[in-house]
């Protein structure tokens, strides 16, 4: 009898404890990032960008670090969420956006020193549902075709990550991500509109990257997907792709638009994506980041290689790295140095004058 009574009391205590834990649980959208600069700068980071004279790097757990001395030292800054961050971009020296898991969009107006949340997956789902119903009521056939996608997006909640962000100016910007997840703002991020039914992506491939070239906006993604934003139609139209593997990034060099991705595949176009030429790379590593470096540009790979383009456009040379790692992103620290983010935080790599002049 005593054993039964003890078991009953224990069960009640366990249930009460579980209920308390459930009531107290807070997800990454509700918990600010923990600030520990030493830990954050030496562990995995996923993206880095230039903000005027500063550099800003982002990574897991909502980590954001800022450097004001070309990457020589870093300071972690407070962030209102602890969601994993994937990409960061600046439209000018002060205004920037970071995006990542849980549908998070963060904005800074002071070169990365402070951040506010402008959108998350829960809000995105509500906006998508409302916009979808309105579009269907107005007779949009494209919206009707997206019903299954929108329904899944709403039902599955805040789990869809944004993988890239690009603002054309301080007001108009785009975010893209997994499973055709895409939104646009025209008021600096105060409000957002879904683009699900305004993208020629019937298989809902992941959207990995955004870039502008010659005044036009492009997107790239899974299985060779390339898209061009038709401003008149307000629609991302598919472009004939030179490659059926995934593209992880796009880079505007001024003269050309570079698309890079899986297994070292790099392509360039100089005629508005009508034709593409393949650029040979020295290794089959997936290319995951790119940045302009003076008159040249550099790419980084998951295999820890830094590739510097040759002046004649014929290919790349591998630049020795002082501390190679599995790279995820790269930005120019100066005309002669790069800052790379990856598996072991951030690294500054100096490119010798001779190496640049010889290319």
Task: Please name every model-derived segment.
Residues 1-9:
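Bacterial N-terminal signal peptides that target proteins for export
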Residues 16-20:
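N-terminal signal peptide c-region/cleavage motif recognized by signal peptidases
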Residues 21-359:
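Residue-level hotspots at or immediately adjacent to binding/recognition sites across diverse folds
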């Amino acid at each position: 009898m005593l054993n039964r009574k003890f078991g009953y009391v224990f069960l009640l205590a366990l249930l009460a404890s579980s209920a308390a834990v459930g009531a107290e649980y807070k997800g990454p959208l509700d918990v600010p990032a923990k600030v520990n600069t030493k830990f954050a700068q030496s562990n995995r980071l996923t993206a880095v960008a230039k903000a005027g004279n500063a550099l800003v790097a982002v990574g897991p757990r909502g980590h954001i670090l800022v450097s004001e001395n070309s990457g020589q030292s870093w300071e972690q800054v407070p962030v209102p969420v602890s969601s994993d961050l994937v990409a960061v971009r600046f439209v000018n020296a002060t205004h920037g956006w970071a995006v990542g898991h849980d549908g998070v969009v963060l904005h800074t107006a002071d070169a990365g020193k402070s951040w506010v949340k402008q959108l998350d997956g829960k809000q995105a789902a509500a906006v998508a549902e409302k916009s979808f119903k309105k579009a269907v009521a107005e007779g949009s056939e494209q919206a009707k075709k997206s019903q299954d996608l929108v329904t899944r997006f709403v039902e599955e909640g805040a789990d869809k990550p944004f993988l890239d962000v690009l603002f054309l100016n301080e007001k108009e910007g785009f975010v893209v991500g997994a499973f055709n997840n895409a939104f646009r703002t025209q008021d600096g991020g105060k409000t957002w509109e879904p683009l699900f039914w305004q993208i020629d992506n019937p298989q809902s491939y992941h959207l990995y990257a955004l870039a502008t070239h010659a005044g036009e906006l492009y997107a790239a993604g899974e299985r060779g997907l390339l898209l061009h934003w038709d401003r008149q139609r307000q629609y991302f139209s598919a472009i004939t792709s030179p490659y059926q593997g995934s593209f992880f990034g796009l880079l505007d060099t001024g003269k050309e638009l570079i698309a890079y991705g899986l297994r070292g595949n790099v392509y360039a176009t100089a005629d508005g994506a009508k034709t593409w030429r393949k650029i040979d790379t020295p290794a089959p590593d997936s290319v995951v980041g790119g940045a302009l470096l003076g008159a040249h540009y550099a790419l980084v790979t998951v295999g820890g290689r830094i590739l510097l383009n040759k002046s004649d456009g014929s290919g790349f040379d591998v630049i020795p790295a002082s501390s190679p790692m599995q790279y995820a992103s790269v930005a120019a620290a100066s005309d002669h140095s790069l800052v790379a983010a990856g598996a072991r935080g951030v690294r500054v790599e100096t490119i010798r004058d001779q190496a640049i002049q010889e290319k």
